[in-house]
Amino acid sequence: MEMRFKMIHENFNVSDLEVSLEFYEKALGLKEKRRKTAEDGSFIIVYIGNETTNFELELTWLAEHPQKYDLGEEEFHLAFRTDDFDAAHALHESMGCIAFENHEMGIYFITDPDGYWLEIIPVREGKTF
């Protein structure tokens, strides 16, 4: 029998949980699904997502790390496909969070409050949302 794996979540550590939650809900429609708070207050973990997939983004806030995280050379990202690319672009432009646009490829990237890159991709021919 072949061993199988299913991706279930990605973790981003954040410096301001409330600012991040507001950003992800406004920019990508991701809402809080569940939360775990340490008894001693040392951390809070919030899982966010939407109805289009079971995959979740885990936002982790650590009490002893109030500053933004060093993301190195930022050579990683999480991608989101949208069924209304033009409206998404207009929203992100109004939020001032577009970091890079690749017109030739028909994609762009936004950054969250901690500097994580998020790729925005339109639905392409032959692909489903």
Task: List the predicted regions and their residue ranges.
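N-terminal beta-strand motif that seeds the catalytic metal site of vicinal oxygen chelate
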Residues: 1-21, 75-78, 124-129
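Acetyl-CoA-dependent GNAT
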Residues: 61-65, 122-125
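Short, charged/polar surface micro-motifs in flexible loops or helix N-caps
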Residues: 51-55, 64-66, 84-86
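Short, charged/polar, Gly/Pro-enriched secondary-structure boundary elements
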Residues: 52-57, 115-118
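Short amphipathic alpha-helices within nucleic acid-binding modules
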Residues: 23, 85-91
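Core segments of cupin and vicinal oxygen chelate
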Residues: 4, 11-54, 109
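Mid-chain, well-packed structural core segment of small domains
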Residues: 71-74, 78-86
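Vicinal oxygen chelate
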Residues: 2-3, 33-36, 47, 89-129
